[in-house]
């Protein structure tokens, strides 16, 4: 029997400083999990945002991002980072982090979402 889940991690930036958030998901031992990963910012184009994506599965992100890491500036709602149908075997881990350098002091929010079926 399959189980659908969604995990959110969100941070709101309210001052002129750097904010950082991360989400780690580990697939249940003995089960494969198919996940979709999304990272986006609101409002768009307010500050530079960097994104990192890592996994303990050797070479598994290479087809999506060579080197298993991605940095994009700026990350906006219209071109949010998306990885679809990423397969994790039981016990595999995916680590997603995002940071915003809120230079203008404008209230902004970054959200990481991992959605999947186990």
Describe the function of each predicted region.
Residues 34-36, 83:
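Hydrophobic residues on conserved beta-strands that form the core of alpha/beta folds
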Residues 36-40, 94-96:
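Buried hydrophobic-core signal for structured, non-transmembrane domains
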Residues 45-67:
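Short, surface-exposed beta-strand/strand-loop-strand elements in extracellular ectodomains
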Residues 27-29, 45, 71, 82-84:
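A structural signal for the main folded, soluble domain(s) of proteins
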Residues 1-32, 90-91, 98-118:
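C-terminal interaction-tip segments
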Residues 40-50, 99-107:
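Extended, low-complexity, turn-rich repeat/linker tracts enriched in Gly/Pro/Ser/Thr and Asp/Glu
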Residues 74-91:
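Beta-sandwich interaction modules
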Residues 13-16, 72-78:
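Short proline/glycine- and polar residue-rich coil/turn motifs
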């Amino acid at each position: 029997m399959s189980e659908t889940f969604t995990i959110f991690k969100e941070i709101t930036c309210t001052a002129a400083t750097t904010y950082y958030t991360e989400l780690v998901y580990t697939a249940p031992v003995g089960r494969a999990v198919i996940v979709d990963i999304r990272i986006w910012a609101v409002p768009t184009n307010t500050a530079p945002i960097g994104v990192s994506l890592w996994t303990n599965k050797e070479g598994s992100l290479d087809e999506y991002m060579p080197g298993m890491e991605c940095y994009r500036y700026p990350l906006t709602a219209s071109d949010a980072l998306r990885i679809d149908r990423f397969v994790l075997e039981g016990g595999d881990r995916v680590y997603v982090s995002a940071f915003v350098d809120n230079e203008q002091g404008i209230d902004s929010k970054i959200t990481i979402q991992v959605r999947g079926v186990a």
